[in-house]
C-alpha cells in the first residue's frame, strides 16, 4: 500500500474491511478440493473422459484406485462441518440450484431442450439424457433432473482433470507441478503437497515434500511447529473462517458455470452453504449459469447491477 497507507508512526491508516466479494468459479478449500472432485466425478470417470498419465490409461494405472480412496474421505469431512447439508443431501442441494437456473432461463425465453433433444455448448453438442421438462414455452418447468447423468454429461462436454486433480505433483505418475501445489512450500522447497493423500503417496525423491523426504506422515508433519504448511492451507480456505469469530464480508456474489468441471459442484455448494450460514453475511447471490464453462465476466451487467444495489443500500 505504501506511504499513503501509514501514519508517522508507521501504523496503518487504512481499514482492511471487505464490503463484498465477487467470485467466478472460486477454486477454494484446496485442502479438500481433491476429495470433493473425486466424490463428484469418480463414479463417471473413464478412459474417454480422464487423461492418461505417462502413457498409462486411467483404467490401467494408479488413477482409478486413487480416485476411490480420495473420494471416500469426503463424506466425513462434509458431515463434520455442520452446515446443514450432508453427504447424503448435497446432490439434492446442487440439483435444486440447477432446477432454479434452468427454470429462470426458460422464463427468459431460452430454448432449453426436452429429454432426447440436444444441448449445445462452446465445446460440444450432446444429447439431453438427464433433464425432463413438463409443459412448453416460457411456462415449462423442470420435472426431473437425473443428477448422476448430469455429472456424466459435464464430463462428456469437457474432459475431466486427471487424478489427482489439484494436489497432483509426485503422485499417480504425474510429472507436472500444478499451479495449486506451487502455492505452498517453504524457502527450502519449490512446492509442497497440501493434502494427506498426496503427501503420504509422494514418490519423488529429493523434492522436500511428502513422507518419503521428510520422514513424517501427513498428521505428524502438519502438527509440527517447525513448518507453516498447516497455516498456509488454512489461510487460503474461506471455510476455515466463515462461521467463526472472524468478521466475514457481508455481501457475496458467487458464480460457477453449469458445465464447469474445473472444480466440483460439491465444493461450490459447500462454500455457498457456509457463506449463507455465517451471521456476518447479509446477502449471498449464488448461481450455476446455464451452459457456462470455466470463465468469468460473462454477466457483467448483472454483476454490476448487484454491486450497485448493495452500495445504494449502504450509503
Task: Describe the role of every protein-language-model region.
Residues 1-44, 233:
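Primarily recognizes the serine-hydrolase "nucleophile elbow" in alpha/beta-hydrolase
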Residues 5-10, 33, 40-64, 83-85, ...:
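Surface-exposed intrinsically disordered loops and tails
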Residues 9-15, 240-247, 310-315:
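Surface-exposed acidic, glycine-flexible loop patches that form ligand/cofactor-binding
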Residues 20, 249-257:
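Catalytic His-Asp charge-relay segment
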Residues 24, 32-43, 68-141, 255-260, ...:
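C-terminal catalytic histidine-bearing segment of alpha/beta-hydrolase fold enzymes
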Residues 92-235:
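Long, low-complexity, polar/charged, intrinsically disordered or flexibly structured peripheral segments
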Residues 231-249, 296-304:
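Accessory recognition modules or surfaces
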Residues 232-236, 266-273:
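Well-ordered, non-membrane alpha-helical segments in soluble/globular domains
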Amino acid at each position: 500500500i505504501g506511504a499513503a497507507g501509514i501514519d508517522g508512526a508507521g501504523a496503518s491508516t487504512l481499514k482492511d474491511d471487505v464490503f463484498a466479494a465477487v467470485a467466478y468459479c472460486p477454486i477454494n478449500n484446496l485442502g479438500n478440493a481433491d476429495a470433493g472432485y473425486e466424490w463428484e466425478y469418480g463414479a463417471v470417470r473413464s478412459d474417454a473422459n480422464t487423461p492418461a498419465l505417462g502413457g498409462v490409461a486411467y483404467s490401467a494405472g494408479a488413477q482409478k484406485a486413487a480416485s476411490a480412496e480420495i473420494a471416500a474421505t469426503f463424506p466425513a469431512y462434509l458431515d463434520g462441518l455442520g452446515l446443514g447439508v450432508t453427504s447424503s443431501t448435497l446432490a439434492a442441494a446442487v440439483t435444486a440450484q440447477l432446477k432454479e437456473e434452468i427454470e429462470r432461463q426458460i422464463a427468459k425465453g431460452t430454448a432449453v431442450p426436452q429429454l432426447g433433444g440436444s444441448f449445445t455448448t462452446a465445446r460440444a453438442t450432446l444429447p439431453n439424457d438427464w433433464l425432463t421438462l413438463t409443459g412448453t414455452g416460457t411456462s415449462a418447468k423442470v420435472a426431473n433432473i437425473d443428477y448422476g447423468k448430469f455429472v456424466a454429461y459435464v464430463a462428456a462436454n469437457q474432459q475431466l482433470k486427471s487424478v489427482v486433480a489439484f494436489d497432483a505433483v509426485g503422485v499417480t505418475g504425474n510429472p507436472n507441478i500444478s499451479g495449486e501445489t506451487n502455492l505452498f512450500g517453504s524457502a527450502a522447497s519449490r512446492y509442497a503437497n497440501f493434502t494427506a493423500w498426496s503427501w503420504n503417496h509422494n514418490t519423488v525423491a529429493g523434492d522436500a515434500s511428502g513422507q518419503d523426504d521428510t520422514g513424517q506422515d501427513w498428521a505428524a508433519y502438519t502438527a509440527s511447529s517447525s513448518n507453516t504448511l498447516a497455516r498456509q492451507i488454512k489461510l487460503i480456505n474461506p471455510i476455515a473462517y466463515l462461521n467463526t469469530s472472524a468478521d466475514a464480508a457481508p455481501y457475496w456474489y458467487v458464480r460457477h458455470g453449469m458445465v464447469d468441471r474445473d472444480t466440483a459442484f460439491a465444493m461450490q455448494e459447500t462454500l455457498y452453504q457456509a457463506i449463507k450460514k455465517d451471521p456476518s453475511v447479509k446477502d449471498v447471490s449464488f448461481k450455476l449459469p446455464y451452459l457456462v464453462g470455466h470463465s468469468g465476466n460473462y454477466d457483467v451487467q448483472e454483476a454490476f447491477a448487484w454491486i450497485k444495489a448493495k452500495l445504494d443500500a449502504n450509503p
